[in-house]
Amino acid sequence: MVGVPHRLLSSPCGMRIKDTMYKRYIKRLFDVFVAVVALLLVGWLLVLVAVFLHFANKGAGTFFLQDRPGKDGRIFRIVKFKTMTDERDVEGNLLPDGQRLTKVGRFVRSTSIDELPQLLNVLKGDMSLIGPRPLLVQYLPLYTPEQARRHEVRPGITGWAQVHGRNAISWQEKFKLDVWYVDHCALMTDLKVLWLTVVNVLKRKDINSATSATMEFFTGNN
């Protein structure tokens, strides 16, 4: 298996949380149904945003592709709208994120539209609508066994941690919320997360600021 060692994918007592009928079967059907409906409803918007980003990004491309760890640590390629240019300084180094973030990109980020292409990841089975966010591959060896339990479910476009602080909480708090979700995954929980996600997006709550395009890196100690 590629990704997280097996020892990191079990609970501290060595026992996995038993799958429920919802977790095992219904959640996937729910994901596919909602993703298809969402793409039919917002497909026109994705095309429009892609056109604007094509020009705003100054040739840097429209989509951002990156390897991320999914369920059981298996690596997949996530797709997002690219919101920054590839502008560099005189020494050839990329400019700080805040300077490369375009006006169009700032709007796309503030409304979380940049995450919508991940509906394709959901249809492919790499992701779920709701689940712990897929983080960087380089974080895998830094997790404690308890933190690594976040990989027992498919990663999500949004999740329990995202509607309870998102970028305003510490990594430790975020991982605790992720593991809580793993143990309490249910239809009503997912519906609540979807509702709170819509509310937070409309309020522009806990979104990265225009001058801070990305959050701090996880080091294993922060």
What is each of the regions a protein language model found here?
Residues 97-154, 194-197, 201:
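A short, structured surface patch at a secondary-structure boundary
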